[in-house]
Amino acid sequence: MGNGMTKVLPGLYLGNFIDAKDPDQLGRNKITHIVSIHESPQPLLQDITYLRISVSDTPEVPIKKHFKECVHFIHSCRLNGGNCLVHCFAGISRSTTVVIAYVMTVTGLGWQEVLEAIKASRPIANPNPGFRQQLEEFGWANSQKLRRQLEERFGEIPFRDEEDLRALLPLCRRCRQGPGTSAPSATTASSAASEGTLQRLVPRSPRESHRPLPLLARVKQTFFCLPRCLSRKGGK
């Protein structure tokens, strides 16, 4: 179920339901606010401020309608010096989707770039195909509209989040590409072919976007970057 919650930005963490009730992790990371987004979210600790969103991890669920509420909650927490944990059951799909929507709003980055940066420190992050489609629909225009609403309510955004996220992008790209060589190795070529196969399995049309990705393909897609990321980190 992972190795604990992941720090995405100052004041913003991503994790699973185990992390959300682990007093050691919560205390160590000074978590003050929690967004619980799964089928039956419940407040567990009296000294934590909760936002509970009931959402199942299925592609057809309209998770996008919760973006505004979650973004305002997370942003208010960070501005007031708190630390917010966003979690679902496994810390893979629902919570990642909400975190991506927030980061898009405060940085102007596209969802693919944000996901790539998150994967640099949390390789299992992997929104389901329907949630990816909703992030695509959320896009730059809607995220910047929400940003203007944040600034009207809270004032100018003081964080340097875009710089922090962009610094992570080269790391995950190098992890996927392997050691810098002009010609791909057999292993890299095989991995690329596998990734291409997985990409073809992801629904492309609006109708198909509601069809769940086969479980095996989702597992392979989720852990595609993990060995290289861990190998690179271990080599430092």
Curated annotation (Swiss-Prot):
Give the GO biological process terms.
Answer: negative regulation of transcription by RNA polymerase II; positive regulation of ERK1 and ERK2 cascade; regulation of oligodendrocyte differentiation; signal transduction
E.C. code: 3.1.3.16, 3.1.3.48
Q: Which InterPro entries match?
A: Dual-sp_phosphatase_cat-dom, Prot-tyrosine_phosphatase-like, Tyr_Pase_AS, Tyr_Pase_dom, TYR_PHOSPHATASE_DUAL_dom
The top EC class is hydrolase
Task: Tell me the active site.
Answer: C88 (phosphocysteine intermediate)
The way this protein sits in the membrane is described as: Lipid-anchor
Please name the SMART domains in this protein's record.
Answer: DSPc (SM00195)
Q: Name one GO molecular function term.
A: protein tyrosine phosphatase activity
What's the catalysed reaction? O-phospho-L-tyrosyl-[protein] + H2O = L-tyrosyl-[protein] + phosphate; O-phospho-L-seryl-[protein] + H2O = L-seryl-[protein] + phosphate; O-phospho-L-threonyl-[protein] + H2O = L-threonyl-[protein] + phosphate
Start and end residues of each stretch annotated as Disordered: 178-213
Q: Where in the cell is it found?
A: Cell membrane
Q: Which GO terms describe its cellular component?
A: cytosol; plasma membrane
Q: Tell me which Pfam families the record gives.
A: DSPc (PF00782)
Q: Where is the Tyrosine-protein phosphatase domain?
A: 4-144
The function of this protein is: May play a role in the regulation of oligodendrocyte differentiation. May play a role in the regulation of myelin formation. Involved in the regulation of Erk1/2 phosphorylation in Schwann cells; the signaling may be linked to the regulation of myelination. May dephosphorylate MAPK13, ATF2, ERBB3, PDGFRB and SNX6.
Q: How is this protein named in the record?
A: Dual specificity protein phosphatase 15
What is the organism of origin for this protein?
Rattus norvegicus
**Gene name linked to the record:** Dusp15
